Amino acid sequence: MSVTLHTDVGDIKIEVFCERTPKTCENFLALCASNYYNGCVFHRNIKGFMVQTGDPTGTGRGGSSIWGKKFEDEYSEYLKHNVRGVVSMANNGPNTNGSQFFITYGKQPHLDMKYTVFGKVIDGLETLDELEKLPVNEKTYRPLNDVHIKDITIHANPFAQ
């Protein structure tokens, strides 16, 4: 199961881990299928750490799950922030997942068991390279020029009715 994020700087194909994180994947895939992420900016970009998106307000403070409320974390000892390209839910503490997610630029073991890992980049690491190179505001880490998710292609959605 995978999706492709079509961004202003290229495509990123992500394998999603539906068996290990079913609720997170149901939320993510439903948001993808409803075009929720279309137009979202990458609002936080920290070189060597991660890039974050998934807030339709573009502020980094918005976004909602498909259930209209925060939902619980799904941790697995098998899913770690151990390579470049790990995809995880952003949160504000335990069990506060909504719509925002991030992609790591490298190993981030301090994030393990704090953020739900639900996917990994399987194609488009060169696009991740382009995102990481973007100049940012040194205080907010917001890219100086907005880069958007234009749209998303879902490849074989197991939750589709």
Swiss-Prot record:
It comes from the Eukaryota. GO terms for molecular function: peptidyl-prolyl cis-trans isomerase activity. It is an enzyme of class 5 (isomerase). Pfam families: Pro_isomerase. Coiled coil: none annotated. Residues 2-154 form the PPIase cyclophilin-type domain. Keywords: Acetylation, Isomerase, Methylation, mRNA processing, mRNA splicing, Rotamase, Spliceosome. The keyword Cell wall biogenesis/degradation does not apply. SUPFAM superfamilies: Cyclophilin-like. The modification Omega-N-methylarginine is found at residue 61. Disulfide bonds: none annotated. This is Peptidyl-prolyl cis-trans isomerase-like 3.
